[in-house]
Amino acid sequence: MGYGSTTILSIGSLFLSPGTAAGLVAPNGSGKTTLLEALSGQFPARIRSGSLAADGICHRRSAEFAELVYLSSSGGADLYPTLSAIEHLAFVREAWKSAADIDSLCDSLGISPYLDKPTRKLSTGMKQQVKLAMAIATDCPYLILDEPLNGLDPGKRKTSCDAMRSEVARGHSVLISSHLLDDLADLTDSFYFIEAGTLVEKIKSSSQTLKQEYLDTYEGGE
């Protein structure tokens, strides 16, 4: 996959099993966002060869690929600035015909106090949590999350991780890109590294082992 005639990544195969969370780890500029955008099905031009399917359904042939939702790393730039957080959530719930319990979701993420504020008045961290709530509110079985913990303090990171963990417990599949290796190691069942333009699956490890493997892979073992 890549841009135009330029190939950026060769991914081989990537499988998300029901009720599992996988982490995507690589330095900036290595193609993580390109990969996640391609996997989302929203950018078919990113895929130069091969195929992409959710529950056996090819995204090029069926609207049922809406079973997958992608949360970008835009930091809230893709939210409508004049609409409130609750208006965003209501729109998502209606668009996906979701039965998600919005009140319970917002309480669990701690965003209830500012639901009525227009998103332009929210901090980066608040916007990030609203976006995560929107992704979960779709009730899609596949969540692709690009840096969902960016801009969050430790307490908010915990509530966000707990929310993602709850989705996994419900049988949903989550793919998470993050540089926060401690959180990622605690949250996920497996990891994928991007090494020299190739996606490589890693065995589940502790956060210390993950950090060391990251250093060995990208920093020459420093």
Predicted regions and their residues:
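The feature captures the beta-strand-to-loop junction immediately N-terminal to the Walker
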Residues: 25-27
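Hydrophobic anchor residue at the start of the ABC signature
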Residues: 132
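Catalytic Walker B motif of ABC-type/P-loop ATPase nucleotide-binding domains
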Residues: 143-147
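Conserved ABC transporter NBD signature motif
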Residues: 41, 45-65
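Q-loop/switch helix immediately C-terminal to the Walker
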Residues: 71, 81-95
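Conserved ABC ATPase "signature" region
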Residues: 90, 99-115
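H-loop/switch region of ABC-family ATPase nucleotide-binding domains
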Residues: 177-179
